[in-house]
């Protein structure tokens, strides 16, 4: 594997770490409703667990309400139960065939708790990015040892990977700041 291939591989893996972090952030409930909040909810559909998006249409009623409309009338109860049982503290209300999920306002204590959760998730994402940097640097050392590249190429490769690491860590920090602002906004 060459320096360029190693850098490209590392960048792709770092991008995947960022995507995973974005998905984790989307699960953190803020005071505002958004359809991504229910993405991880699993519904018992005739004996098998499937994502809620496969059995219902999810939309926004207003800024603080998610509307869920199951495609089959008899699934209303199962979908409502799945939303109630997910660990988001939501209390869905069924109105005919439509389930309305109001977002309860967050207490100050809960906001601070969520901020800590976000920071913890961010630290995990940063560690993943740094581990990828370490793996790339080990790969460069191995290439030098095998005489596939020069020490100058190794140094350049390490510098480039460090720049990528800095870029992705800064992106994580930016995402955390935005999410904290969103959480703390009353």
UniProtKB/Swiss-Prot annotation:
Keywords for this protein: Cytoplasm, Protein biosynthesis
Pfam families, alphabetized: RRF (PF01765)
Compartments in which it is found: Cytoplasm
Residue pairs linked by disulfide bridges in the UniProt entry: none
GO-annotated cellular components: cytosol
Recorded superkingdom: Bacteria
Function: Responsible for the release of ribosomes from messenger RNA at the termination of protein biosynthesis. May increase the efficiency of translation by recycling ribosomes from one round of translation to another.
Entry protein name: Ribosome-recycling factor
Organism: Cupriavidus pinatubonensis (strain JMP 134 / LMG 1197)
């Amino acid at each position: 594997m060459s320096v360029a291939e190693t850098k490209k591989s590392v960048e792709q893996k770092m991008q995947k770490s960022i995507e995973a972090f974005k998905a984790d952030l989307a699960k953190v409930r803020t005071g505002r409703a958004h359809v991504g909040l229910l993405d991880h909810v699993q519904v018992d559909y005739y004996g098998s667990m499937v994502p809620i998006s496969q059995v219902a249409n999810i939309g926004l009623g207003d800024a603080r309400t998610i509307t869920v409309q199951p495609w089959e009338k008899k699934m209303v109860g199962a979908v409502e139960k799945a939303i109630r049982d997910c660990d988001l503290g939501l209390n869905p209300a069924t109105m005919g065939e439509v389930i309305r999920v109001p977002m309860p306002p967050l207490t100050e204590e809960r906001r601070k708790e969520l901020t800590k959760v976000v920071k913890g998730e961010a630290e995990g994402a940063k560690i993943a990015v740094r581990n990828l940097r370490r793996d790339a640097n080990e790969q460069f050392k191995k290439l030098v040892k095998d005489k596939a590249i020069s020490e100058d190429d190794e140094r350049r490769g390490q510098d480039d990977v460090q720049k990528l690491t800095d870029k992705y860590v800064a992106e994580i920090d930016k995402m955390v700041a935005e999410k904290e602002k969103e959480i703390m906004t009353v």
